[in-house]
Amino acid sequence: MKKMFIAAAALAVVALANAQAPADAPYAVKSGVYTMSMDMMGNEMITEYYFDDYGKKTATVSEGGGMMMMGGDQGGKTRTIEVEGVQYRVNDEAKTATKMPDFGGFSGGFGGGQSQINWNKLTDEVKKANNIKELGKETVAGVECTKYSMTMESMMGSMDQTVWIYKGIQLKNEMNSDMGTFGSTCKKFEEKAVDASMFALPASYKVEEFQMPDMGGFGGF
């Protein structure tokens, strides 16, 4: 019995070693899903984030209404994925996809305030460039997060943010800019396996190029 216990313990150690995140991984969690809630002009927008391979594969699923401004579908659910460096908005019900342009690192889908910073590999250079300061620990969605303040430059101007990070994953944020104050909060977080199809674009789907929506009186832009 003792030998069996030692063997089992050894196997557990080996399994843990094999499960370590790669050096360049965005997250320190292998796979999972978390649900973010964001207030969009008085309406709650729910976005589900799926990830695998320690954050190297990601997908978001949102209700269509909040995606209208950036060329998404106006109804139903929209799945956003990246395939070979290109972002696609996928409507699985209609079996269609929209190939999105490069917004220069800006997430056009109001992605819960997710930033482009690799919080799992936070360097002194990144901290200095974004004026990042650690504020302590707080619990969000049942897990302990590290709280940071920061200032970022984006296409919307200078933006002050407070973010809550769990193993590289941003589970809460509050943003202040010239356009106002907004943010998002994780309502549920689960570490679990995610089906590979969540990150794939079926070959049978019809793919269309992104079309900038008609902005009416803003034709001068």
Regions found by a protein language model. Give the residues of each.
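Extended soluble regions of mature proteins
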Residues: 21-221
